[in-house]
Amino acid sequence: MKHAIHHIHFVGIGGAGMSGIAEVLHNLGYAISGSDLSDSATLRRLAGLGIATHVGHAAAHIEGADAVVTSTAVQSDNPEVLAARERKIPVVPRALMLAELMRFKQGIAIAGAHGKTTTTSLVTSVLAEAGLDPTFVIGGKLNSAGANAKLGQGDYIVVEADESDASFLNLLPVMAVVTNIDADHMETYGHDFGRLKGAFVDFLHRMPFYGRAIVCVDSPAVREILPQVARPVTTYGFAEDAQVRALNVRAEAGSMHFTVRRSNGQSYPDLDVVLSLPGEHNVLNALSAVAVAMELEISDDALLRAFESFKGVGRRFQRYGELAAADGGSFTVIDDYGHHPVEMAATLAAARGAFPGRRLVLAFQPHRYSRTRDCFEDFVKVIGLADAVLLTEVYAAGEAPVVAADGRSLARALRVAGRVEPVFVENVAELPAAIAVNARDGDVLLCMGAGSIGAVPGKLVEMLQKQELQAQQGAAQ
């Protein structure tokens, strides 16, 4: 049946998931437009591709659109959404549009509380190295591709599946990975962990009867749902009973070296892997890609090449290099999206392994008052693992403030715990200057959070380079 959809408008096009879908549809030949509340590098990149972008929301922006796609961050009273409904233009949630894209290819969906973006990127890289030319939509920039989405010519599409709003239940993959299940985004599930686990079972049952579930049995909640999963399953992890298992794990110069043992009914040789990512959590992410490769009969050589040449993902342990410290030496800057205590603990451990013996400075912007409230004690414990801490006010992400779940309360709790004396920087715009004052020679600075702190490393680099240039000019006079 010939449809009449030619022009698709995205409300909130600056988000990682939205921009990726928009780019793939643009490359499929659709006329794409979009708007976002603020300007960003993403908007500018999309404009460079020929996509009409707007800063701010207005009813006029949807002129000529045959469908309007919305992100979960967009409210129902958004002027573009209201105008679309008034004109009887279909308003489509992001996940439904992603599901439409997946209908035309063999879908591989990556779900889980933590590690989705890196795992999706690793799986994509393995398929690309094997010559399968996948389409992908990722929640972060795949550095080797310079983008978070690409329209491939192959049979597969690799996507992140978002459980935060239960929208992953719209997808119909033929293969699904579950990296872990954790108590995050609990408001979506009525603060009922059983409902959250049930949603993951339902997600796996969105696959056809022949679909393959690839799950990490190191996650207790994943292990708990296994008896309910009525699909073929491959397990992975460090656990002795995992069918794809990592042994002899060691960190070397920012990479992970380990042996993969595979035992899912067929005879496979052990694989000695070099993964160009730090941290044991990334070893687990890589194991899921091994399981996908086994299912698709990808050669071990392609798998090993993909892991060793992996160039990482934007804002996932992203290195900004060495910057001049105030005491005359230099410090290393790393940017990371981690914003849940479990993610932060894994990233801090990875930093310890990659930079043994060095002082670890954590600059952290909490994300959402509800998460800060629900995970307050865990935040205190994990933040205290750093040697020095700079803490900002909570990035609200549209939420109203919650009493005793703000940045100052977290700073006070850290002081009471006595493990670290935090420097509280209320305005994130002042964080680069505070970092410059506190960073010493040999430090490793980790900027972490899912909010506006993502712009801090770039601004810090710009500020210190400007200061260095001014100093050189002053010395020359």
Swiss-Prot record:
Q: Which GO terms describe its biological process?
A: cell division; cell wall organization; peptidoglycan biosynthetic process; regulation of cell shape
The protein's GO terms of the molecular function aspect are:
ATP binding; UDP-N-acetylmuramate-L-alanine ligase activity
Function noted in UniProt = Cell wall formation.
GO cellular component annotations of the record: cytoplasm
Q: What EC number(s) does this enzyme carry?
A: 6.3.2.8
Record has Kinase as a keyword = no
Catalytic function, reaction form: UDP-N-acetyl-alpha-D-muramate + L-alanine + ATP = UDP-N-acetyl-alpha-D-muramoyl-L-alanine + ADP + phosphate + H(+)
* Key words, A-Z: ATP-binding, Cell cycle, Cell division, Cell shape, Cell wall biogenesis/degradation, Cytoplasm, Ligase, Nucleotide-binding, Peptidoglycan synthesis
Q: Where located?
A: Cytoplasm
User: Which family does the record claim for this protein?
Assistant: Belongs to the MurCDEF family.
**Species for this entry:** Delftia acidovorans (strain DSM 14801 / SPH-1)
Q: Which Pfam families match?
A: Mur_ligase (PF01225), Mur_ligase_C (PF02875), Mur_ligase_M (PF08245)
Query: This chain belongs to which protein, by name?
Result: UDP-N-acetylmuramate--L-alanine ligase
